[in-house]
Amino acid sequence: MSSGISESGSVWLEFMGSGVKETFYDAGGRRTRVLEAGAGQPLLILHGTGGHAETYQRNIGPLSQHFHVIVPDLLGHGFTDRPEVDYTLDDFADHLFALLDAMGIHRSHVSGESIGGCIAAWMTIKHPDRVDRLVLNTGILDRPDEKGLVQLADLEKRTQSLRDDCSLDTVRRRLEWLVLDRDTMTEEMVRIRHRIYNQPGMVDSVIRVMHAVLSMNRGLYCGHDYMARERMAEISRPTLVLWSDHNPGKPFDVIKPAIDLIPDAEVHIIKDAAHWPQFEQPDMVNGLMRQFLLRG
């Protein structure tokens, strides 16, 4: 085991007693893996680029005490199908609506981290009738500044390096980009992601999705300006924005004008966190989400 990696907070210890189950659904012909737990109003939670459902290991249990928590592996991620598509926000959103249909759910709360937040915003814009309340966690429809593009390019480089060396150390370096303190990252999370990435064809899929995400952040992609800031004004559902004080790629001062366009939004800055506040500061994030969503 490498030094600096904590063994605390194992996935199973976090899940014990919460009734978390792994289910595979047919979502519009795409085999889709979901971790779910709890009863009550549905809460769809979306991970970021290159992620998987275990991203929310510290949130599923606590939130499942109040909601039916649904955490899928996104299209092209984890153990969900990896079709030959462009991986636009439309592709992701359409797949998730198909998943909700397969589960017999018409309307839910939606929360997303990083590109998951962008997808959640896009779902709300496309079909506001299917979203109750929206939570954006370090993900928003807006472009990074020049410094942010450099930081995202660094993440892309770390991702591309997996093609030649998908070792534990390479996976660890990519995960460490996400957190403020690398000691926050557990060895178990590194090993989970290492196993996922070592599926045949998985690294190529992650690189393809990473290219799509960066292309959307840089400008037009597949003929659409998905990250146009003004689209945030089209969000008609109550919105909670959770940002961190050390978010790479899109710091708060850069994206605040986009937040200001949301008609009904409240904002909280999570201290001592980078791109994974739900993992770095789970008690704070779980509490804020619970309070906000229970108002709906």
Annotated model-derived regions:
Residues 26, 30-79:
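Conserved HGGG/HGGXW glycine-rich cap/lid loop of the alpha/beta-hydrolase fold
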Residues 73, 109, 132-135:
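Residue in the alpha/beta-hydrolase core beta-strand immediately N-terminal to the catalytic nucleophile
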Residues 90-108:
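Conserved acidic catalytic loop of the alpha/beta-hydrolase fold
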Residues 92, 110-112, 137:
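Short beta-strand immediately N-terminal to the catalytic nucleophile in serine-hydrolase-like folds
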Residues 112, 116, 120:
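Gly/Ala-rich beta-loop-alpha elbow adjacent to hydrolase catalytic centers
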Residues 125, 132-173:
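Flexible "cap/lid" loop of the alpha/beta hydrolase fold
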Residues 202-256, 260, 269:
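Conserved serine/cysteine hydrolase catalytic core
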Residues 262-296:
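Catalytic active-site module of serine/aspartate enzymes centered on a nucleophile-bearing elbow/loop
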